[in-house]
Amino acid sequence: MRKRITSMITVISLTLCGTIGTYPHNANASAKEAFEDISKRSECTKVFDNDNGTYTAYSNTAPIHYLNNDEWKEIDNTLIEDSDDYYRNKDNSFNIYIPKEYSLGKNIKNPVIMNYDTFSLSTSITDIKMPDRPEEETFSEGVYADINNEVYTTIDNSAIAEGMKAALKKSASMATYHSIVEDIDLDIAVHNASVSESIIINKLESLPETITYSISVEDAIIKKTEDNRLQLIKDNEAVLILSPFTISDSSENVNVMQVEYDLTESEEGYEVTLYPAETVNRMSSPVMPLSLGSEYSYDRPFSTVYNSQASLHPSIIIIT
């Protein structure tokens, strides 16, 4: 089985807050599954009624809810069919549209689309220059996506309420395009507050000299920061951030290096040209496959506001 490397921003690391409220407890009451108190939701927290006079709160490291008309809705990143050309994540304020068919070339039919608030971005790989390979051989006629809605298949912690486990299992999904170029695959992973792309290079002789992305934005500009991130700015505020591009190998200790790139303006918006071969040439004995990764995440204030006016004061905090 080929080892795959994917960039996953959502870390399932939970803070379990026990004994939030203490009420009369009936010791003879039969044990029941804890149920969620929806009125106590926050962006990153669920609160469960244990049906014995106590509550348990679970605080995730990434959002598990989004605010919709003053109501905290549960995020569901299951990829579902949206149209003849696209899949989309089922329920999130960060709306992602994944093409059913991915093809390389200057005339992009179906780019990846990201919508958040009033912001919209579309992106696609337009060019991969391979060593000693004619350009026409690098463009694929179209590769169909393999969809994986079970990125998190098991969460082995008996202390976690089933409702929380179900929410975590819906927090990530992935589309894989096999052989967009010979010996090169593409993974696009959807998370609760980000989208990551990983270009999987399976053979060293197929390492591209350059990879070019086209990025289009509506009523916004893109700037490169001193730390090699890209900021997508609208109304003088950064609304989306693209992390530095990195390439990593499959060695036990994992060699990771930043990939140099150029940002230029184009008729469609912007072009980002990466130089992976230059980077890998500086690696010491890289182990295949390689993964060239990037991640788009929206810039958001961390929110802990509850729908309910109830104040929660946990007396026991367990870190798992």
From Swiss-Prot:
Signal peptide: 1-29
One cellular-component annotation, GO: extracellular region
Catalytic residues (positions): 150
UniProt entry keywords in alphabetical sequence: Carbohydrate metabolism, Cellulose degradation, Glycosidase, Hydrolase, Polysaccharide degradation, Secreted, Signal, Xylan degradation
First-listed, main subcellular location of the protein, grouped into a coarse class: secreted
Location(s), subcellular: Secreted
EC annotation from Swiss-Prot or TrEMBL: 3.2.1.4
Catalytic function, reaction form: Endohydrolysis of (1->4)-beta-D-glucosidic linkages in cellulose, lichenin and cereal beta-D-glucans
GO MF annotation list: cellulase activity
An individual GO BP term: cellulose catabolic process
Protein function: Hydrolyzes both carboxymethylcellulose and xylan. Probably has a role in hydrolyzing oligosaccharides derived from cellulose, which are transported across the cell wall.
The protein's name: Endoglucanase E
Organism, scientific name: Ruminococcus flavefaciens
